[in-house]
Amino acid sequence: VSFARPHSPYDPPQRYLDIYKNAPVPDPAIGDWCDKYAKKLDPEKAAQDAPYGNFGNEYARNSKRHYYANITFIDEQIGRVIQTLKKKGMYDDALIIFVSDHGDMMGDHYHWRKTYPYEGSTHVPYIVKWPAADHIAPGKIDAPVELRDILPTFLDVADVTIPADMDGRSLLPLAKGTETNWRKYLDLEHATCYSDDNYWCALTDGKIKYVWRIHTGAEELFDLTKDPQELHNAVNDKKYKKQLEEMRNEMIRHLSERGEEFIKDGQLVVREKTMLYGPNYPEK
């Protein structure tokens, strides 16, 4: 089941928006690294799909209210699906995975919408309701999982052989506590979109995040355990020197199979152009 909401435009039905009309909403998170976007802008004069912009805290809070209302709308629709499964006697046998393909920055660090390596854009829900026959107790698993794991999981639960060349891995052994060799990091990456410097690769285990800007060579390092809102880029902090080197080396190993366009002489290569070629991006 696929829903367009809560994707922009933020247009919830009015009765859901009324729920959040006077609700307290936090201001956006603003890091010490995003001054280039800090200039105050008039939202009435900005492009409707502006990817960056400081439109003020009240604008950001109002956007969040609309976003929250859309999420509540979706929650109610999912509830209808679940109630229908229960009425038909199908719920106990069902495997349900609730995920999203991306989040939304909602003004954090003066960024809007998606395609960024930051938590607002990348850290999405991943909720699994297992069939009763699998006897998996409710709980939270602290492991890096990704959307590519969905299909192998469904095949595994259905007792169908998972092809060896399939991307992703079944979550069932992880949920049962029998998985002993799970992935260490998630790979995040994006080709040029919105601006030339929005071309990046990142690695994270959910505790530390390393970002490599492929056009510029700029690096970012966030300690998500101590700084979950990514308020401080620790790339120049001496106390994070070892972790920076470790994550950089992990990125080198990760990208090495792609050849000299990405890694040369054991070093990350700054690319002048993106790998994104197409009629809409003739100069990229």
PLM feature spans:
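Structured segments of extracytoplasmic/periplasmic soluble domains
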Residues: 84, 88, 157, 237, ...
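Active-site-proximal cap/lid insertion segments
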Residues: 2-144, 157-165, 212-215, 219, ...
